[in-house]
Swiss-Prot record:
SMART domains: GIYc (SM00465), HhH1 (SM00278). Residues 16-94 form the GIY-YIG domain. This is UvrABC system protein C. It comes from Bordetella parapertussis (strain 12822 / ATCC BAA-587 / NCTC 13253). Pfam families: GIY-YIG, HHH_5, UVR, UvrC_RNaseH, UvrC_RNaseH_dom. One of its GO terms (cellular component) is excinuclease repair complex. GO terms for biological process: nucleotide-excision repair; SOS response. Its main location: cytoplasm. Gene3D superfamilies: 5' to 3' exonuclease, C-terminal subdomain, GIY-YIG endonuclease, UVR domain, UvrC, RNAse H endonuclease domain. InterPro entries: GIY-YIG_endonuc, GIY-YIG_endonuc_sf, GIY-YIG_UvrC_Cho, Hlx-hairpin-Hlx_DNA-bd_motif, RuvA_2-like, UVR_dom, UVR_dom_sf, UvrABC_protein_C. It is found in: Cytoplasm. The UvrABC repair system catalyzes the recognition and processing of DNA lesions. UvrC both incises the 5' and 3' sides of the lesion. The N-terminal half is responsible for the 3' incision and the C-terminal half is responsible for the 5' incision. Interacts with UvrB in an incision complex. The lineage of its organism: Bacteria, Pseudomonadati, Pseudomonadota, Betaproteobacteria, Burkholderiales. Keywords: Cytoplasm, DNA damage, DNA excision, DNA repair, Excision nuclease, SOS response.
Length: 609
């Protein structure tokens, strides 16, 4: 520790109050963030002789100072801790990927509700069901609701402008409320039954449909009875195919932890309304040497900090901090979940299955990790880079690519490879402006100057390898930029396409004068380079297309004779965007105010020509 940091005096002055502490190294970088019910006791515990975790012992040896923040409560400390972990990503905290928000199934608040896949803040009017572990689980549930209850999935703009039933009605997946095939009351009943099904009342819904079918048959309403019979048949198939269990109606998350080969997997399974919706594996970083219970606690703290916790958590290990779930509930303004570590009955089988899935996901990850690390090693050996384990893990590769269509909407992409894998959160796109359309050299000069100008100013990290998608010309442009910025040109490598642009025939071109190298199509190093190069190309293409579409969307309609700003606005408002206008029939187009039959034909031909 530095001489100006008096540890003994610092610890003596700490209060017996809740708060957050941060361990900093000699460079002032935050290495670890934690919360405490009692700051004095918790921070002092790090400086005892015997620490259970080798990782934490290694961190403590590097501590140069400690910052503390006193909070009004332990719940407030938990919130601050999670915010700091997310923003700082300290290298000694167990970290879970801050994933996209989970998807939900939404039944809208429209007079004729639609069912929809939804991801984002749950602020729209309607009923939300979930969260689901993945998009596939939501879409499967939507298909079930279409089969059984025949609820609509079309956008409101399409619903409001249909003149005849769509294909979904013809195949029995929609009751066509858009054109009045079903009465409002009957459709509302179908929606209510769908809600009850999603809430775990599938058996009760089945009994109700059967009773209504028998009544309709008795009253000689055979057509209605046939519809109800088909509903019952579809629901019966679902009940046989799905695992539907009656466990008190409480939604449940099942969390299992598996460890092997120095890696840990946390597997989260979700049960909603008695239906097992599937599971999702998580692989934390900085968890080497940690006990499964500690990793489980970190997962619970980070995963439920921003999201709703279900009434029941079934866990493979007991949480070291028994008060954590209560703090999360207090923070979110909800009731604390029941935590079960020795479940019985069906919950026990859920946990056993989650544990098996965690172990299988971990085995797959270890196999893939070994293969990825092997490719990184092969590349390092081919390019004469450091090959020790730490250097390979820290090897950062950035690849740049330029994309445009005949000079329009030129965009550069930068993708990043780090820790033996692509890192999408570090990808960047650059809009290229002020150059002659189609001048790829000028575009490359601009993006490299913008990106590595920050490196020269000490504001961004310098990668160990910079890949340029191109041959001698592009590499020479990159070399000039690096020389102007005072950067080492040895890290610059161009990937020149082979004869016929065939994969495996690429040649590596070096900026420092080394002779070109052809690694061969069987080379693991070339496989890695091709993966990074192709990802840069994909990322650039998607960005360019989005930018081009954005600039074209407005102009495509206004280019049609007879369409001005006012008519364009009416069309976009009626059909919800250009794609809706493109999907509309001539009759639908002609129903818009100010659009004649002749103009509707002209619009249709222009968008479909």
């Amino acid at each position: 520790m530095p001489d100006d940091f008096n540890l003994k005096s610092f610890l003596a002055d700490l209060p017996h109050l809740p708060g957050v502490y941060r361990h900093l190294d000699a460079a002032g970088e935050v290495m670890y963030v934690g919360k405490a019910r009692d700051l004095k006791k918790r921070v002092s515990s790090y400086f005892q002789k015997n620490l259970a975790s080798p990782r934490i012992a290694q961190m403590v040896a590097k501590v140069a100072s400690v910052d503390v923040t006193v909070t009004r409560s332990e719940a407030e400390a938990l919130l601050l801790e999670n915010n700091l972990i997310k923003s700082l990503r300290p290298r000694y905290n167990i970290l879970f990927r801050d994933d996209k928000s989970y998807p939900y199934l939404l039944i809208t608040g429209h007079a004729w509700p639609r069912i929809a896949y939804y991801r984002g803040a749950t602020s729209k009017r309607g009923q939300y069901f979930g969260p689901y572990p993945n998009s596939w689980a939501v879409r499967e549930t939507i298909q079930i609701l279409q089969k059984v209850f025949r609820l609509r999935t079309c956008e409101d703009t399409v619903f409001a402008n249909r003149s005849r039933p769509c294909l979904l009605h013809q195949i029995g997946r929609c009751s066509a409320p858009c054109v009045g095939v079903i009465e409002a009351g009957d459709y509302a009943h179908d929606v209510q039954r769908a809600v009850r099904f999603l809430n775990g009342e599938a058996r009760e819904v089945m009994d109700e449909i059967e009773a209504r079918m028998l009544q309709a048959s008795t009253e000689l309403r055979f057509e209605e009875a046939a519809v109800l019979r088909d509903q019952m048949g579809s629901l019966s198939k679902v009940l046989h195919q799905q695992t539907m269990e009656n466990v008190g109606g409480d939604d449940t998350d099942v969390i299992a932890v598996a460890s092997a080969g120095g890696k840990i997997c946390v597997n989260l399974a979700m049960v909603r309304g008695g239906r097992h919706l599937g599971d999702k594996p998580f692989f934390p970083t900085h968890a080497e040497g940690e006990q499964p219970a500690q990793v489980l606690e970190a997962f619970v703290a980070q995963h439920y900090a921003d999201g709703a916790m279900p009434p029941v958590l079934v866990c493979s290990h007991a949480l070291p901090d028994s008060g954590l779930v209560g703090l999360l509930a207090e923070q979110g303004g909800t009731r604390a979940a029941r935590v079960l570590t020795r479940p019985q009955g069906v919950r026990r089988s859920w946990l056993e299955q989650a544990q098996k899935n965690a172990e299988m996901a971990l085995a797959r990850a270890l196999t893939e990790s070994g293969a990825r690390a092997g490719r990184t090693l092969a590349l390092a050996e081919a390019l004469d880079l450091d090959t020790d384990e730490e250097s390979l893990d820290a090897l950062r590769i950035e690849c740049f690519d330029i994309s445009h269509t005949a000079g329009e909407a030129t965009q550069a992409s930068c993708v990043v490879f780090l820790h033996h894998d692509m890192q999408p959160s570090l990808y960047r796109r650059y809009n290229i402006v002020g150059i002659t359309p189609g001048d790829d050299y000028a575009a490359m000069r601009q993006v490299l100057t913008r990106r590595f100008g920050k490196v020269a100013d000490g504001e961004a990290p310098m990668p160990g390898l910079v890949l340029i998608d191109g041959g001698k010309g592009q590499v020479e442009v990159a070399r000039q930029v690096f020389v102007e910025l005072g950067l080492d040109i040895q890290s610059l490598v161009g990937v020149a396409k082979g004869e016929g642009r065939k994969v495996g025939l690429e040649t590596l071109v070096f900026a420092d004068g080394r002779p070109p190298v052809a690694l061969g199509k069987e080379s693991a190093a070339l496989m890695l380079i091709a993966q990074v190069r192709d990802e840069a190309h994909r990322f650039a293409i998607t960005g360019m297309r989005a930018r081009r579409a954005k600039t074209r969307n407005v102009s495509r309609l206004e280019e049609i004779e007879g369409i001005g700003a006012r008519r364009r606005q009416r069309l976009l408002a009626r059909f919800g965007g250009l794609s809706g206008v493109s999907s509309a029939s001539i009759e639908d187009l002609a129903s818009v105010e100010g659009i004649s039959q002749e103009l509707a034909v002209r619009i249709y031909d222009a968008l479909h020509g």
